[in-house]
Amino acid sequence: MSKDDSIEFEGSVSETLPNTTFRVKLENGHEIIAHISGRMRKNYIRILTGDRVKVEMTPYDLTKGRITYRMK
């Protein structure tokens, strides 16, 4: 799958789950499960409940995503 196929949304972290997984509430009202991207994991970027994040999703499964950016 190429990067062009992914869909980006913004949302806020509503709950922290085990294994660097988070429940994210998107701006359109949907709630998804998202994990941290490898680059964020490598650079030890911490994500807390309430943080605004950018989530990348595939059009094939709209219930899971990857957190690619934490807003300041």
Swiss-Prot record:
Keywords: Cytoplasm, Initiation factor, Protein biosynthesis, RNA-binding, rRNA-binding. GO terms for cellular component: cytosol. InterPro entries: NA-bd_OB-fold, RNA-binding_domain_S1_IF1, S1_domain, TIF_IF1. It is found in: Cytoplasm. Its main location: cytoplasm. Residues 1-72 form the S1-like domain. It comes from the Bacteria. GO terms for molecular function: ribosome binding; rRNA binding; translation initiation factor activity. Signal peptide: none annotated. The keyword Metal-binding does not apply. Component of the 30S ribosomal translation pre-initiation complex which assembles on the 30S ribosome in the order IF-2 and IF-3, IF-1 and N-formylmethionyl-tRNA(fMet); mRNA recruitment can occur at any time during PIC assembly. One of the essential components for the initiation of protein synthesis. Stabilizes the binding of IF-2 and IF-3 on the 30S subunit to which N-formylmethionyl-tRNA(fMet) subsequently binds. Helps modulate mRNA selection, yielding the 30S pre-initiation complex (PIC). Upon addition of the 50S ribosomal subunit IF-1, IF-2 and IF-3 are released leaving the mature 70S translation initiation complex. Belongs to the IF-1 family. PANTHER family: TRANSLATION INITIATION FACTOR IF-1, CHLOROPLASTIC (PTHR33370:SF1). This is Translation initiation factor IF-1. It comes from Xanthomonas oryzae pv. oryzae (strain KACC10331 / KXO85).
